[in-house]
Design a protein with these regions (language model features):
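Conserved active-site and cofactor/substrate-binding residues in soluble primary-metabolism enzymes
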Residues: 11, 91, 95, 133-137, ...
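Conserved small/polar residues in nucleotide/adenosyl-binding loops
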Residues: 243-245
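Glycine-rich phosphate-binding loop plus the immediately following alpha-helix
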Residues: 124, 128-155, 176-234
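Glycine-rich beta-alpha junction loops
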Residues: 59-62, 114, 165-168, 185-190, ...
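Glycine-rich, mobile lid/loop segments that gate access to catalytic sites or pores
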Residues: 113, 119, 126, 130, ...
């Protein structure tokens, strides 16, 4: 039997899912700011779920499968691509990753789309965000569910996975059970909070492109909402022309 936990560090929430031989034993969700404010408390929560065989840690843009205890500072820089103290984006992920690495928990960092050998090299040129590590995990789940639901082998599964998150919209292409391409949230279409791919001239006019810029300018901003009252459900009943445009 295998006892595992997956950590999904989203813009709005950090979610935990634990499976014991396929049966759910942990399903928790925390506001992101709250979860990352105290890495030690978060680690303690995971330790209470022991014994564990594996934890899929918060991996950002991903790394080749790497035990957290062996991850270097350069690995963490590449996985999270944010300067120390950067206020924009998901602040606190790197300190959490360090805390997990210092623990005795069996944490591994997992790959993003760009790390996959199944993705042709020419598609990776001048790309970074082809899909974060959590998107790869979502695609793996979709492939498995599609195979089981249609009673066909994995190599017969082809699909397009679209994920509409709290900030970003991303898409992954699967053919023959393998991820072949992806468009990550910062390179894709408009998201709920994120503007998605930026026109090069927009980036030029911005002057600088801090991490916070990647997390703004989305559908909620077009609708004129601030972060406190932003909710996708509000689009069901638009009350102004601007909301109708979105």
């Amino acid at each position: 039997m295998t006892r595992v936990i997956g950590i999904d560090p989203g813009t709005v929430s950090v979610d935990l899912c634990g499976l014991d031989d396929g049966a759910l034993f942990l399903d928790r969700s925390f506001p992101t700011a709250e979860a990352l404010a105290d890495p030690a408390a978060f680690v303690a929560l995971l330790e209470r779920a022991a014994p564990l065989d594996l934890i899929a840690g918060p991996s950002g843009y991903g790394l080749p499968v790497t035990p957290a205890a062996r991850a270097t500072e350069e690995d963490l820089r590449l996985a999270f691509l944010a300067a120390e103290g950067e206020a924009g984006g998901i602040g606190g992920l790197r300190p959490l990753a360090r805390a997990l690495a210092r623990s005795a928990l069996p944490v591994v960092f997992t790959p993003g789309v760009i790390h996959l050998a199944s993705v042709p090299e020419h598609r990776k040129v001048n790309r970074v965000d082809m899909g974060t590590a959590d998107k790869v995990c979502a695609a793996a789940l979709a492939i498995d569910e599609q195979a089981r639901g249609t009673n066909r082998p994995v190599h017969k599964v082809s699909l397009v996975l679209l994920e509409l998150g709290g900030a970003f919209t991303a898409g992954l292409a699967v053919e023959g059970g393998r991820i072949l391409d992806g468009i990550g949230g910062t390179a894709g279409p408009l998201g709920f909070r994120s503007a998605g791919a930026l026109d090069g001239e927009v980036a030029f006019l911005a002057g600088t492109v801090p991490k916070s810029l990647l997390f703004g300018g989305g559908a909620a901003a077009v609708a004129g909402w601030d972060d406190a009252d932003a909710s996708p459900e509000r689009f069901e009943h638009p009350t102004a022309d601007r909301k109708s445009v979105v």
